[in-house]
């Protein structure tokens, strides 16, 4: 009878993650998870639906769950109120063992967003990553219990309440600290221009704009 070697060990989660292919297809478990998240987002609380919309790429018959378009639609006294901001979220094959990445497509002028659109937020960081410009408590780093909703809601908080102690955009951080009135004008100007561009060029953004109008 075959006996397993005493020195043989079972694969650990770290081993599985290392084998993840960022450009490969989603694992079946990841596909199921993201499909379920899509359904939950459709029945989200009304107040949350007013803050963002999230859509996997592709048609209903041919979904690409690896890439999602995120549309932020903040209201109230936000500097982005009435505007649409777009970001793209990309998922690794092993999601949720590893976090997705998020990058703004809309041009942003914000202390916690790099000029290339990358977002600095602890919820998207793995334990092994050490980035001093990441916003958030280190205890809040990525775990598999996080999801699209928790990520986006964390970003909403940062958009409205920048943290200048660990900036990704130094110019935005300095202006926010030393010349807040000018910062407000610049953010509003850029948000308006990016919103107008999205509505002209992005069919999904136009659908989001119609939803915003219907809810107001």
UniProtKB/Swiss-Prot annotation:
Record region (Disordered): 1-29
Catalytic residues in the record? 120
Instruction: Give the UBC core domain ranges.
Output: 29-196
Pathway(s): Protein modification; protein ubiquitination
Task: Return the Pfam families for the record.
Answer: UQ_con
| Keyword Transferase on entry | yes
Chain coiled-coil ranges? none
Q: For this protein, what reaction is catalysed?
A: S-ubiquitinyl-[E1 ubiquitin-activating enzyme]-L-cysteine + [E2 ubiquitin-conjugating enzyme]-L-cysteine = [E1 ubiquitin-activating enzyme]-L-cysteine + S-ubiquitinyl-[E2 ubiquitin-conjugating enzyme]-L-cysteine
List the Gene Ontology MF annotations in alphabetical order. ubiquitin conjugating enzyme activity
Q: Which residues form the signal peptide?
A: none
Q: Which InterPro entries match?
A: Ub_conjugating_enzyme, UBQ-conjugat_E2_core, UBQ-conjugating_enzyme/RWD
Q: What superkingdom heads the lineage?
A: Eukaryota
Among PANTHER family, the record links this protein to: UBIQUITIN-CONJUGATING ENZYME E2
Name the chain's protein: Probable ubiquitin-conjugating enzyme E2 ECU01_1010
Lineage summary: Eukaryota, Fungi, Fungi incertae sedis, Microsporidia, Unikaryonidae
